[in-house]
Amino acid sequence: VTAALGTLALLLATLAALGGAAALLRGQVAGRPALVALGERAPAAVFAFVTTAVAALEAALLRPDFSVAYVADNVSSGTPLLFRAIALWGALEGSILLWAWLHAGFTALVAWRYRGRYPATVPLALAVLLGIGAFFLLLMLGPADPFAPAVPVPADGRGLNPLLRNHPLMAVHPPFLYLGYVGLAVPYAFAMAALLSRTLRDEWAAVTRRWTMAAWAFLTTGIVLGAWWSYEVLGWGGYWAWDPVENAALLPWLAVTAFLHSAIVQERRRLLRLWNCALVILAFLLTLFGTFLTRSGILASVHAFTVSLIGPLFLLFIAAVLAFSLAVLLLRRDQVRDEGALPAYLSRETLFLLNNVLLLVLVATVFLGTVFPLVVEAVA
């Protein structure tokens, strides 16, 4: 019954996300406020349905119900209660569910926070957020099903990965990282919506500043907690051991740090418009890249899950997001032209840009160093 409830909730959440995005887009393009109003209710429905799915999986983990394959693979009758609860994000399917839940929460907060405000922009931003959420929900209706049945049903489960039950930081480190990752979808969605609607040309950066700062703070906390944890486990080598997944967490942090500095220049001087849009797109794409590395299993890492079928799907999604973002920039290239030029050398704005360049050099260095083994393997 628990598994059936969870699966039904995920199906309804997917339908609500896809239907809401379609209603928002259709209503905005056709000028039909009733459709837009209907679509703006979708984020709350999606969050409610995904919350139901999370509650169903948590109930199965706490019981524990070994008829659910995820439960049988990640807890046992001897697993302490705390680690049964946090096993929700201890493996592939549960981590995707956590991501979808947090994303649904952010989307619902955006819908609530900006209800009735920026009517030309917010519906499009919500449509982008719902579309992103729909991808993760569809994964769970396919290759990453957290409610798949265990066949045959074992008498006891395998228990959580020993590396994950050695420290209580398992309870907070992954959620903070995920909050940082998911939070970066908000400035990305607003940047795309501002370009498409030709509104909030410079204001979108200010409107999303708190969301960006929150995502940066969550990501920073997650990285610091992970660094602390890495020194508690023999064989992990501490932080930073050039682990691909550690690199993948650092990449969006560097990109969003650069954006937080350069956004000030856009807000005050109406400069770096294209640069800031590119930084937001890059930061969001890097969160997807990090998720791909962790969940595809293509690189050896103490953090990575086993090889799964969702790796190619993530690559396709990353390619789709990149293509969509570039198309929007090309379509609205007049919107990202600067008004004037940067002031003289050694001005505050020029120093901010230099800071950005240094951070992006770090991004390029870490990224190339991370994917280099894949390139060598492909060539070989």
What are these regions (language model features)?
Residues 1-380:
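Polytopic transmembrane helical bundles with strong interfacial aromatic enrichment
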